[in-house]
Regions:
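A short helix-loop-beta-strand connector motif used in the catalytic cores of GNAT acetyltransferases and
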Residues: 53-66
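Conserved GNAT-fold acetyl-CoA-binding loop/helix
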Residues: 29-51
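Acyl-donor (CoA/ACP) binding surface of acyl/acetyltransferases
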Residues: 1-32, 66-167
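Hydrophobic residues in alpha-helical segments
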Residues: 25, 34, 56-58
Length: 167
């Protein structure tokens, strides 16, 4: 599946995207604000994508979309739309390499995912989680029109900041 905006193309993740995801998953900001995947090589990342991410999380129009900058045709980030066990609504997420930050790409990609969620998947609400200390992500969600709901435990006993957007 492919989604696009004026400046970006969002393609469903593939195992051959492993070099990009290895770089993203090992970015210090990704580790600090999202999760440490503890992947030590491109080969480990390829296996992770092939065995865990793609088969478990990418189906029924949901999953991880590699975000490409159209002008240079290079991957700069990821946007996701997931169904989580402890929630009733789809969860939008994003992460960008330093090369893709500060240019409005996260806003543009997330807005694209939101439009897809409403128009194609026919959802009336979408949610997003972010770590409480991730101020940049909170600002982005607020700019997109999300409302802060409070803290909610989503996994591993940690409470994340929950935001919602009603279409």
């Amino acid at each position: 599946m492919i989604l696009s905006t004026e400046r970006l193309t969002l393609k469903m993740v593939e195992a051959n995207d492993a070099p990009f995801y290895f770089e993203l998953f090992n970015d210090p900001d990704f580790i600090k604000n999202i999760n440490d995947k503890n992947l030590k090589s491109v080969e480990e990342t390829h296996t992770f994508l092939q065995q865990k991410m793609i088969p478990n999380l990418c189906n029924d129009g949901l999953g991880f979309f590699t975000v490409y900058e159209n002008e240079r045709n290079i991957p700069i980030g990821v946007s996701s739309l997931l169904s989580r066990e402890k929630t009733d609504y789809y969860d939008v997420g994003y992460a960008f390499l330093p090369i893709g930050r500060g240019k409005g790409y996260a806003f543009e990609a997330t807005e694209c995912i939101m439009k897809y969620t409403k128009e194609v998947l026919k959802q009336d609400k979408i949610i997003a989680f972010t770590m409480p200390q991730n101020q940049a992500s909170k600002r982005l969600l607020t700019k997109l029109g999300f409302n802060y709901i409070g803290l909610k435990e989503i996994h591993q006993g940690n409470k994340d900041s929950l935001f919602e957007y009603i279409f």
